[in-house]
Amino acid sequence: MLLRIEDIDAPRVVKDADRWIMDDLTWLGLDWDGDAVYQSQRLDAYEEALRRLRERGLVYPCFCSRADIRAASAPNEGDGFLIYPGTCRRLSAGERESRVIRGDRHSWRLVVPDGAPADALGCASSHVDDAAQAMHAALAVGLPRVVCFADRVFGPQRFDLPRQLGDVVVRRSDGLFAYQLAVSVDDMAMGVTQIVRGRDLLRSTAIQLYVRRCLGSADMPEFAHLPLIDAADGRRMAKRLNSLDLGAMREHGDDPRAVVGYCAWLLRLVGEPRPMTPQELLPLFSWDAVAADTADRVVDVDMLLR
């Protein structure tokens, strides 16, 4: 397991949050290989990646504000994600250059292909290895309009880039590198082979696979997206639930084994919550069990803290 501290958004970084994360992991009985990687120390790598994208003509300056984009776009698929309408993509090269020289505030966006969708990207296969091989073959012949991958939990995924994602920001107008570029560069540099995260990032996976291809990589990690955890009122878990903050639980004297066991139960790996260590959980783990129930989970605080 690799530990990466994603502190690239400097204005939002909380002092000592990295140490809290490490302390929480240690308390749960989890460790990681090697030193933690800090994104704030890898700005040169992101700058180099952006330079390569610019050399290939795959990015362009965008002068639109968030208000401009909201006014010109409709939310996609009811989830609030805005598809950039391509306003600045249609500007002439001369107009783009003159506005940059003039100092107009701008971000940098990555171009996604237009044209007929490419269908041979692995979506027809439900097998992870078959999908990966098809994806590699399709990426080898050029930049795809359609990105597909087989998820360990949610199965085959297919994203039409211009229709569902649009030209994504890789450097923000405030000069900070965007999450999608930074994590893609880091995953390649760190040799990440398996990524497990929430289902709300399925769309991000398609973006990141495309970013990787634009940077010359056809390798595809194995992905597993998990159901989200909701509070009892049906809303997503948030920091407002201080009682479930791991640091607060540790200070309160709660048993970390109870947390691990409860998570195992949420993932349908055990029939009922019971205290266990990560080492005791390992032989019980099964992706088939996790994938058998993809509904979001609701946390019962009383059950967890009893």
Question: PLM features: residue spans?
Answer:
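N-terminal Rossmann-like or analogous alpha/beta NTP/dinucleotide-binding catalytic cores
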Residues: 1-78, 200, 204-218, 276-280
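A short, terminal or domain-edge coil/loop segment
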Residues: 54-64, 117-119, 127-130, 144-145, ...
